[in-house]
């Protein structure tokens, strides 16, 4: 199962990428982020821990990192693996489309509510990112 949200932002892809590659900037656009760590560099295969408000710390792995284009991370849950995609699509006109995708590795209809809950703050976080980049 998969949900995505995309929004056009007046920014260079390099500026948008800084909000992903620099974990200190995650606190600017992830409102419920309490703590995030990364063991190693921001590159494919690196692992870390993320803690969101009201949730226990969760381990994640960066499964794909393409600088200035996209990164994906994976978190294991009792309902199946969750993949989070963060893409920067360059419009070659001084703007980019930021697209965040959440995929739950399950086809079980009972897990749909869980996926909806995980995805629920994604649109708002992209609007916050837009405000950060366009100010």
Locate each region found by the language model.
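Hydrophobic ligand-binding cavity/cleft-lining segments
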Residues: 1-37
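Well-ordered beta-strand positions in beta-sheet-rich domains
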Residues: 4-6, 57-59, 83-85, 101
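A short, structured loop/turn motif at beta-sheet edges
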Residues: 10-14, 64-68, 87-97
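Hydrophobic pocket/interface hotspot
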Residues: 16-20, 26, 62, 71-73, ...
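Glycine-rich portal/gate segments that line the openings of hydrophobic small-molecule binding cavities
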Residues: 37-79, 83, 131-135
């Amino acid at each position: 199962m998969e949900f995505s949200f995309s929004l056009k932002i007046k920014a260079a892809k390099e500026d948008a990428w800084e909000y992903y590659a620099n974990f200190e900037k995650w606190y600017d656009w992830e409102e419920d982020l309490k703590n995030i760590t990364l063991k190693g560099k921001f590159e494919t295969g690196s692992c870390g821990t993320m803690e969101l408000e009201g949730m226990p710390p969760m381990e994640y792995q960066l499964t794909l990192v393409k600088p200035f284009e996209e990164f994906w991370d994976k978190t294991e849950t009792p309902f199946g693996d969750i993949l989070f995609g963060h893409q920067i699509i360059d419009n070659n006109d001084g703007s980019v489309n930021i697209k965040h995708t959440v995929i739950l590795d399950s086809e079980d209809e009972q897990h749909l509510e869980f996926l909806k809950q995980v995805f629920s703050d994604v649109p708002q976080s992209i609007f916050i990112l837009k405000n950060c980049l366009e100010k």
